[in-house]
Curated annotation (Swiss-Prot):
Residues the record lists as N6-(pyridoxal phosphate)lysine modifications: K226
Protein's recorded name: Serine hydroxymethyltransferase
Organism for this UniProt entry: Aquifex aeolicus (strain VF5)
Compartments where found: Cytoplasm
Required cofactor(s): pyridoxal 5'-phosphate
The keyword Transmembrane belongs to this UniProt entry's keyword annotation: no
Gene: glyA
Function: Catalyzes the reversible interconversion of serine and glycine with tetrahydrofolate (THF) serving as the one-carbon carrier. This reaction serves as the major source of one-carbon groups required for the biosynthesis of purines, thymidylate, methionine, and other important biomolecules. Also exhibits THF-independent aldolase activity toward beta-hydroxyamino acids, producing glycine and aldehydes, via a retro-aldol mechanism.
Site note Plays an important role in substrate specificity, residues: H225
Lineage: Bacteria, Pseudomonadati, Aquificota, Aquificia, Aquificales
GO annotation, biological process: glycine biosynthetic process from serine; tetrahydrofolate interconversion; tetrahydrofolate metabolic process
Amino acid sequence: MEHLLKTDPEVFDAVVKEYERQFYNLEMIASENFTSLAVMEATGSVLTNKYAEGLPGKRYYGGCEYVDVVENLAIERAKKLFGAEHANVQPHSGSQANMAVYFAVLNPGDTIMGMDLAHGGHLTHGAKVNFSGKLYNVIHYGVNPETELIDYDQLYKLAKEHKPKLIVGGASAYPRVFDWAKMREIADEVGALFMVDMAHYAGLIAGGVYPNPVPYAQFVTSTTHKTLRGPRSGFILTTKEYAKAVDKSVFPGIQGGPLMHVIAAKAVAFKEAMSEEFKEYAKQVVENARVLAEELKKYGFKIVTGGTDSHIVLVDLRNKNIIGKDAEKALEKAGITVNKNAVPFDPLPPTKTSGIRIGTAALTTRGMKEDEMRKIAGWINEVLSNMDDEKTIQRVRQEVRELCETFPLYPELKRRIDELRSGKATDL
């Protein structure tokens, strides 16, 4: 970071402050994680200088022999990790991965089915404010009001009635497992294609603790930065039948040159996810979430669906008479970072919400386990029971800081920053 400090002290200062925020706070936003230093090194490598439109061996630029090596590694590792016939690792994000699949098999005005955003779905699954809701005729399925689990009977009835061309599975705030086999069965019966957006669950699937949709879906999309613990990006898995259509849809359909430095980081992340250590990590992520959910229930919090099968704990705050927006702010003051989130059949708008979404992926990366989850549940209860008590909030803030120091984040980076700040660095 010495070059950044010398060239642009203002950006250096902002980066360091963000590092310190991550270090001294409990990052519990379910879509966030901490990459390895190897992933960050790949992202910051000389590959950022290279244009490489096209696919390995079929580029529109010269000098691509080494970026071809990198992209082929990423492709083969993604296929092996998830058991897929074909992978495209060029999408810049999960949203663009979804767009590429839509553009590959749909025409404007076609009918698609996706999970209602208010029930845990994602913007790109047909929300009105998103391109997917503007270009396509969207029918939403949701959860049962009693169990808060996906209502497959409703999904089936809607599919029979509306005959969608594509059914989309996956979510951004659904803590339980999906029945991929049942969804594929419904899709086949109505003549629909089946796509799964596994962005939130990809790392858990790679680790073998969450059902793999690849055997059931013609298309599987994902980000790489959530539970998969890679760079901020996306990828697509598909069958040989749809490989050419997907590749053409990504380039030249919706993107130009791929980000080769990010593809290198994806290759690294896929390799890391193949390890036994990663399998243990994924298992611990889910165990931490389950313990956190059970502890919060002991304090009287209502957990949506009654628990979790993943890294997500969705808390309905209505029985506590707390608005999600206020809970998010109070917890942030205490050093606990979560996000306000709608709960099923939420009467409040998304700017306020009746719930919060909590995730365990990032803290598990830091090495925290069940005992820490119990402690954190207690802090969440203390803060949300005393939201106007500054003394309580500051006491919890100090205790959070002490816990974070026990599980240091990127200690090598901290030492380097300290050297640069003190002027002791010798290679400026």
